[in-house]
Amino acid sequence: NDDDSSLPVAIFDVTLTNVTEKKVKTTVALGLQNILGLPEIGKSENRWIDKGSHRGIVMTTQRHDQDSPRFGSMALLTPNDDVTYQLNFEETHWFRATESLMDEFGTTGEFMGPKDSLVCPENQAYVAHLGIKAELAPGESVTKTFVLAWLTPNFEKYWGERHVWKTYQGTKWDSAESVAEYVLENMPKLEGQTRKFANTFFSSTLPTYVLDAVSSQMSILRTPTVTRLTDGTFYGWEGCHINSGCCEGTCTHVWT
């Protein structure tokens, strides 16, 4: 369905396999920088949540008003309970931050940085990390799940006469955290729908060159090249520059 297909989310299932003959302790981790409001960054908060069924890092901005096109939120959550995290690098000289991270995390599998909520200074962007720990017997495999969600609820028409309006996702959700929670609560349904679509599409009688042409371009639907207007109407650029869309108007020579 179109609503679930429009979820601003990425799901990472990471499978770890112990190929040794000894028990292994390991941690798989993701890092996320709070770049909300880019290029006007800073005064953004990183905080930890634990709601029993899931836990993780939530990022918000205090610099931008809720009706600003630079307002938004991000969330990095997991349903796994044996975790380690930090909301920024440890306090140290800037050129030592990543080296210290790899020294400590690479040795212990634990993050040693700050655990309490942080608001970064203006024009800075703190980097948080979430790790999921595992202990594997010889030959054992486990899968750990990360859910990364984002929400930028306001669309800016910055060419010609400027206007700002709600994106469709902005009318459906109040935060990236709520998006991630919906995904975690409905994971079996969402995965089932996705696999059903993929299996149906690739088992069809369409010529192989049609299957290739359609499937190879399908990921564009998950990029800033497209958006949905307030009422859900689909809107697409011809393509994307680094910081803007290219050729507005859902042009018919590209979108047919």
Predicted segments, located by residue:
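Short loop/turn positions at the edges of beta-strands in beta-sheet-rich folds
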Residues: 20, 138-140
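Substrate-binding groove/exosite segments of carbohydrate-active enzymes
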Residues: 7, 110-133, 140, 144-147, ...
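Polysaccharide-binding surfaces and accessory modules of carbohydrate-active proteins
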Residues: 1-107, 130, 157, 161-208
